[in-house]
Amino acid sequence: MSTQGFLKPRSIEVEPVGPNHAKIVMEPFERGYGHTLGNALRRILLSSMTGYAPTEVQMTGVVHEYSTIPGVREDVVDILLNLKGVVFKLHNRDEVTLILRKNGSGLVLASDIELPHDVEIVNPEHPICNLTDAGKLEMQIKVEKGRGYVPGNVRALSEDRTHTIGRIILDASFSPVRRVSYAVESARVEQRTDLDKLVLDIETNGVISPEEAVRQSARILMDQISVFAALEGAGDSYEAPVRGTPQIDPVLLRPVDDLELTVRSANCLKAENIYYIGDLIQRTENELLKTPNLGRKSLNEIKEVLAARGLTLGMKLENWPPLGLERP
């Protein structure tokens, strides 16, 4: 079957919106292809982009993440949260262990981390903590290359290593894509007015540009669907890979705290044992409205935050919760 009759985009425009933020406009597409390709690219952009993140930390004098450090104003939990906001970029390596040492009063920044020549910090002014006059901070930070979002408890289960006292395993958000959404608008070519225009709105953390993110996601999509183009007649055999446990979208494994809801909304969800985004999207609007202290305003907030990630309430998930998912 020939595909020559299908329209392909003749125009691709990149409209910068801000630092690491752009709108990418493509047109024309056959009717319906805007949603087909836009949704596929959005899901790949959110879950499958390669990036870098701190995965383990060891601090001098710290046994566990609920400790405090004399002379440091923030507790260890806050330090770890701030550390997750540091954007690393590794060149020609998949992992590295970095050192941070700081003494005396002042603000500790990402730029205080000692870097080898092939490691870069995209946001060196990012704050990590504050020290008093007698303060002293020393830590080892392991940074790894990966995809999507991997909870620390899942990584701990998959690793066959002796647990070291003071070794803190972090939830790792590798994805360099912070936000992505798409819209489909009407397009026209000559007398045809039933065509689609696809608008991708992408913001990254600076490790890659929005344009490069789209290129990488398109390559992943092409690679995955190329197997279908290789299918031939019924008499020809095709050896499919052995299927294991169906993979869960890494976005669904993120805690609801990552949605940055108001404290009231977040507490209401946790009171109903909703700890992960995968828990939340399976609830319906009516179920959430029955939650004590969660009103229509909070519900609308939740719906808006989910919509920004291409998710909705009332979705059905198979094999949820995944094996090994820890409950607080």
UniProtKB/Swiss-Prot annotation:
Name the Enzyme Commission number(s) assigned to this protein: 2.7.7.6
Disulfide linkage: none
Q: Which InterPro entries match?
A: DNA-dir_RNA_pol_insert, DNA-dir_RNA_pol_RpoA/D/Rpb3, DNA-dir_RpoA, RBP11-like, RNAP_asu_C, RNApol_insert_sf
The answer, when asked if Transcription is one of the entry's keywords, is yes
**Which keywords belong to this entry?**
DNA-directed RNA polymerase, Nucleotidyltransferase, Transcription, Transferase
Substrates-to-products reaction catalysed: RNA(n) + a ribonucleoside 5'-triphosphate = RNA(n+1) + diphosphate
Q: How does it assemble?
A: Homodimer. The RNAP catalytic core consists of 2 alpha, 1 beta, 1 beta' and 1 omega subunit. When a sigma factor is associated with the core the holoenzyme is formed, which can initiate transcription.
* Name of this chain's protein: DNA-directed RNA polymerase subunit alpha
User: Gene name on record?
Assistant: rpoA
